[in-house]
């Protein structure tokens, strides 16, 4: 449990597009009094810290530093965004061997100075790397969290909201499983302000059929690829997703977010990190929720878990 105190320290490992934008989003949110940026490119972190610090007059007081692992000591949360970037046409799972090797050098250094921190993994493939972090750190599963399908879920809400012309915040739904190509949309539990989506669509004379579900799902699943094809990388939305998770932890909100967590017995799935609805609070992941899926969704989730397990088993650098 993160103890309430006058200062809050967050370290961000990796100062690429995602890491730097995450630091910016955290700065704007006002959740931290100190943000430390660490990267192999020291000049880059120095430049990012300088640029961010020059805006200190416009936000709540925050000290932004460029440092090394020693400077992260005593962090409440360590956000890990370091790793090779996903290239055009490259899947998240194809990144695995590059990023596992990077994590083998990062995680021991993070743990050395942060025995009590919560580790929030953002680097892709996030579910696999969350599991790797869990194993390398020796931390309890509650304190090793992946950003999971928080962003994917936001994309799904956005797609439904756009088509139905409603506030996406009124859409209750989840993307579960891998943050990637095998993720699943939980249509069976999707509702609009507690009205089941099929009932809502029927009442409002809106489209809701197999074609609708397929189009929406494909748009969500391929969203990152579409962004990468156009601008080279995704970073704004994931930075906001990470900030949302951080706020839930630091505020001990006990809110439900579909983060990546160690699944131990859910539809027969064991020993793998997956995006699951979890209660997130001051202790990290306080509980993973075993929501009831229909047979098709459950089968797809099992396959998603198998995909991730096979990737881990086939990783040449483990």
From Swiss-Prot:
SUPFAM superfamilies: LDH C-terminal domain-like, NAD(P)-binding Rossmann-fold domains. InterPro entries: L-lactate/malate_DH, L-lactate_DH, L-lactate_DH_AS, Lactate/malate_DH_C, Lactate/malate_DH_N, Lactate_DH/Glyco_Ohase_4_C, NAD(P)-bd_dom_sf. It comes from the Bacteria. NAD(+) binds at residues 18, 39, 44, 69, 83-84, 105, 122-124, 147. Substrate binds at residues 86, 92, 124-127, 152-155, 234. Gene3D superfamilies: Lactate dehydrogenase/glycoside hydrolase, family 4, C-terminal, NAD(P)-binding Rossmann-like Domain. It catalyses: (S)-lactate + NAD(+) = pyruvate + NADH + H(+). Its EC number is 1.1.1.27. One of its GO terms (molecular function) is L-lactate dehydrogenase activity. The modification Phosphotyrosine is found at residue 225. Keywords: Cytoplasm, NAD, Oxidoreductase, Phosphoprotein. Belongs to the LDH/MDH superfamily. LDH family. This is L-lactate dehydrogenase.
């Amino acid at each position: 449990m993160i103890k309430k105190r006058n200062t809050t320290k967050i370290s961000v490992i990796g100062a690429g597009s995602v890491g730097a934008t995450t630091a910016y989003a955290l700065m704007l949110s006002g959740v931290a009094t100190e943000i430390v940026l660490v990267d192999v490119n020291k000049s880059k972190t120095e430049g990012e810290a300088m640029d961010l610090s020059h805006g200190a007059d416009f936000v709540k007081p925050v000290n932004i530093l460029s440092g090394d692992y020693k400077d992260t000591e005593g962090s409440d949360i360590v956000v890990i965004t370091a790793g090779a970037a996903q290239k055009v046409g490259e899947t998240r799972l194809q990144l695995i061997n590059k990023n596992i090797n990077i994590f083998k050098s990062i995680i021991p250094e993070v743990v050395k100075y942060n025995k009590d921190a919560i580790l929030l993994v953002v680097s892709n493939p996030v579910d696999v790397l969350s599991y790797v972090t869990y194993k390398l750190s020796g931390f309890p599963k509650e304190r090793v969290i992946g950003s999971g399908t928080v962003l994917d879920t936001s994309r799904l809400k956005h797609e439904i909201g756009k088509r139905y012309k409603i506030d996406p915040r009124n859409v209750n739904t989840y993307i579960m499983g891998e943050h990637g190509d095998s993720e699943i949309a939980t249509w069976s539990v999707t509702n609009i302000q507690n009205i089941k989506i099929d009932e809502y669509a029927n009442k409002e004379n809106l489209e809701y059929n197999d074609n609708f579900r397929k189009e929406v799902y494909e748009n969500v699943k391929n969203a990152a690829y579409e962004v990468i094809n156009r601008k080279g990388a995704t970073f704004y939305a994931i930075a906001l997703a990470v900030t949302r998770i951080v706020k839930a932890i630091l505020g001990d909100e006990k809110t439900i977010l579909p983060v990546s967590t160690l699944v131990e017995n859910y539809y027969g799935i064991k020993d793998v990190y997956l995006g699951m609805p979890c209660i997130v609070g001051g202790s990290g992941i306080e509980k993973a929720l075993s929501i009831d899926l229909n047979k098709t969704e459950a089968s797809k989730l099992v396959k998603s878990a198998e995909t991730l397990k096979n990737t881990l088993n086939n990783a040449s650098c483990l």
